[in-house]
Amino acid sequence: MLFISATNTNAGKTTCARLLAQYCNACGVKTILLKPIETGVNDAINHSSDAHLFLQDNRLLDRSLTLKDISFYRYHKASAPLIAQQEEDPNAPIDTDNLTQRLHNFTKTYDLVIVEGAGGLCVPITLEENMLDFALKLKAKMLLISHDNLGLINDCLLNDFLLKSYQLDYKIAINLRGNNTAFYSVSLPYIELFNKRSNNPIVIFQQSLKELMSFALK
């Protein structure tokens, strides 16, 4: 199981998750995408949420899948899951134990299960648990996606420090947009220096699909 988080929201988790799953499936690794918790959605009028995109991809493997099979807590409010849950369904806190069991059931059918979190690692799910706690409970490997803008160095290093302190098996990958030429002069020079000293180098996502698939499966 691979848990995908990010330096923050809008870093490109969903795009990267889909690309990695498509690559894995093309390589013969049967892969499913799950979005157990999603906020800021209105399923009655909008069918382009993260989970809807995942469902579209997943149904290439299993036409019987529905949205409820891959996304279990869905809220209108675009906020941390805890806040959305307390406002919209205050008597039904998110049960990460139940989620863990449901997500692990997919490992019986698929070679690789990719679980996308909401926001970053410290986003609260309950009063006691955040996304990092959830990933630890799942015993999943971690792929942390970084944006490619100015400031990514600080964001990557903070997340690297946090993940290292919890002794997770993790990789950090930069979601590099094709038109971001500034990255090569502004951020890449330090990333290259960091990688020379680190036993867990930061990679560029688009250039590392084979490596990331191998990491997820080993």
Curated annotation (Swiss-Prot):
It holds the Pfam family AAA_26. It is found in: Cytoplasm. GO terms for biological process: biotin biosynthetic process. The keyword Magnesium applies. Pathway: Cofactor biosynthesis; biotin biosynthesis; biotin from 7,8-diaminononanoate: step 1/2. Its cofactor is Mg(2+). The active site is at K35. It is an enzyme of class 6 (ligase). CDD domains: DTBS. Catalyzes a mechanistically unusual reaction, the ATP-dependent insertion of CO2 between the N7 and N8 nitrogen atoms of 7,8-diaminopelargonic acid (DAPA, also called 7,8-diammoniononanoate) to form a ureido ring. This is ATP-dependent dethiobiotin synthetase BioD.
